[in-house]
Amino acid sequence: MNAPEKLRQHDRAARAVGNIVHLEHFNVVIGDQRLATLFYVVGLGGTRDPYLFMGLENMWVNFGRTQVHLPSRGTQPRPEVLRGTAGFVVPNLDDLVRRLEHAGTEMKRIAPELPNNFAFQRKGDSVEATCPWGNRVRCHAPAPEFGRTELGLAYVDFDVPPGTADGIARFYNEVMRAPASAAQGRATVGIGRDQRLHFTESAAPQPAYDNHHIQIYIADFSAPYEWLKSHDLISMETDADEWRFQWIVDPRDGRKLFQIEHETRSMKHRLFGRPLVNRNHALTNMTYVPGADAFRGTF
């Protein structure tokens, strides 16, 4: 029997997820698949997608319901670097440190001649790492702030110019229709169940934008598009279920605030909800248990 209406005291707004339902991947060009495999697969514990992009031109690495896309276009690719930090949830930080130590040793063994920015450090309740091309990663153990996720891309925290956080929050609230707020020089955007985008103001010099991107799925696919199109901000018309834009602007005055390409897809896109393979990265040939090949955590 349903409880009497007067006894129900739920904050329904607190359970809303907003218009951006999923942050699926970030994409950066890499210089060498060997080093990328050692960092993202051996070190961080991701799983190379076994079905798509199995050659040398690109590799997709699965982390729960999310991915990192790592194309290596051309014979001399120009690596791309996020202007910020990618935040992951991993099952166990102690295991992560051991994997990163091994990955670093292997990088020196197989490619000592290549420039390599790889580094990592444990800092309290997180592990901060840098990929061979300079992308910054921060890994966390599962925690209530990340919901029930035990493996996945939890957030991207961008470094943005001073004085832009309030306008960035307005952009996501008013244009993208996602819950966003700004406080103390930082804008935070809610995505889906437990993911976020952060935009943290920094006085440090900004490197030039190099065309890396993030990919999001949105529920209302038309209203943000119409606003962006009317302001001449659509950068690519991909197909019926995808468009892209690069500039975050203040909707009050149109001032350009930060450049990061958003690969924006509808929930009817052919890849939405695609099941991703995730291996049990603790398993080896010496510890193999039949039926334990797949990651059994929650994501």
PLM region spans:
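Vicinal oxygen chelate
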Residues: 1-19, 21-31, 49-50, 59-66, 73-158, ...
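Hydrophobic, helix-prone linear segments
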Residues: 1-65, 75
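Conserved active-site tyrosine of GNAT-family acetyltransferases
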Residues: 36-43, 100, 134, 168-173, ...
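Glycine-centered, phosphate/nucleic-acid-interacting loop/turn motifs that mediate DNA/RNA or nucleotide
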Residues: 44, 176, 232
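Active-site-proximal beta-strand elements of phosphoester/diester hydrolases
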Residues: 70-72, 198-201
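Solenoidal tandem-repeat scaffolds enriched in leucines and small polar residues
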Residues: 162-170, 176-181
